[in-house]
Amino acid sequence: MKVYSSIKKRCEHCRIIKRKGKRFVICKVNPSHKQRQG
């Protein structure tokens, strides 16, 4: 999980979701694409 001030989708399988006021990128195909904002 990488933390960025600006998150973006890295492939077509990535999904941006909000949990507890934080934005996350989750990707089942490439778990290395996981990101968190803030």
UniProtKB/Swiss-Prot annotation:
Q: Tell whether Protein transport is among the UniProt keywords.
A: no
Q: Is Ribosomal protein among this UniProt entry's keywords?
A: yes
Identify the gene encoding this protein.
rpmJ
| GO terms for biological process, alphabetical | translation
GO cellular component, alphabetical, reads: ribonucleoprotein complex; ribosome
Q: Tell me the protein family, please.
A: Belongs to the bacterial ribosomal protein bL36 family.
Source organism per UniProt: Chlorobium phaeovibrioides (strain DSM 265 / 1930) (Prosthecochloris vibrioformis (strain DSM 265))
GO molecular function annotation: structural constituent of ribosome
> InterPro entries, per this entry?
Ribosomal_bL36 (IPR000473), Ribosomal_bL36_sp (IPR035977), Ribosomal_LSU_bL36 (IPR052010)
Its domain of life reads Bacteria
Query: How is this protein named in the record?
Result: Large ribosomal subunit protein bL36
Swiss-Prot/TrEMBL keywords: Ribonucleoprotein, Ribosomal protein
Q: Which NCBIfam families match?
A: rpmJ_bact
